[in-house]
């Protein structure tokens, strides 16, 4: 008996909506990454992009446990000498909560061509409204 290998032409993609209100950032991000990779499907094949689309709403209401809001920093380099910048997560949550979820999920995806293709299927919105009603997304509850 041969093992099943998914082909890119056989992949059927669904749309899911996840409400991030009151959810812990890391736990939420790992579940989203699993859906983007397609690991929740029995047809999962590591070298084929079998994942689904994910729309995250209420990104501004995601929770960080402990004192991470004050202690954790997002660091980035501008490309100039002395250009290592850091922003406290508390400030980042106020200005760009969509980026916090995007960055957490991106770190859990493969660091290759497949991962770059997978992250494009993640749509994150600050409030409860999103513009993907036409795709008829299915509501997904994550604990």
From Swiss-Prot:
PROSITE patterns: RIBOSOMAL_L13
Membrane among keywords: no
InterPro entries reported for this sequence: Ribosomal_uL13, Ribosomal_uL13_bac-type, Ribosomal_uL13_CS, Ribosomal_uL13_sf
GO cellular component terms attached to this protein's record: cytosolic large ribosomal subunit
UniProt keyword list: Ribonucleoprotein, Ribosomal protein
Gene Ontology terms describing biological process: negative regulation of translation; translation
GO molecular function, one term: structural constituent of ribosome
Quaternary structure and interacting proteins, as annotated: Part of the 50S ribosomal subunit.
PANTHER family membership: LARGE RIBOSOMAL SUBUNIT PROTEIN UL13M, RIBOSOMAL PROTEIN L13
Family: Belongs to the universal ribosomal protein uL13 family.
UniProt function note: This protein is one of the early assembly proteins of the 50S ribosomal subunit, although it is not seen to bind rRNA by itself. It is important during the early stages of 50S assembly.
Protein name: Large ribosomal subunit protein uL13
């Amino acid at each position: 008996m041969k093992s099943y290998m998914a082909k890119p032409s056989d992949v059927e993609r669904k749309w899911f909506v996840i409400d991030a209100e009151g959810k812990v950032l890391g736990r939420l991000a790992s579940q989203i990454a699993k859906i983007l990779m397609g690991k929740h499907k029995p047809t999962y094949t590591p070298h084929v992009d079998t994942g689904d689309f994910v729309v995250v709403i209420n990104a501004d209401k995601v929770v960080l446990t402990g004192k991470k809001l004050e202690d954790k920093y997002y660091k980035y380099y501008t490309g100039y000498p002395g250009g290592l910048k850091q922003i406290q997560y508390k400030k980042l949550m106020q200005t760009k909560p969509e980026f916090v979820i995007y960055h957490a999920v991106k770190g859990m995806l493969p660091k290759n061509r497949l991962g770059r293709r997978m992250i494009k299927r993640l749509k994150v919105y600050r409030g409860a409204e999103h513009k993907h009603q036409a795709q008829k997304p299915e509501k997904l509850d994550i604990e």
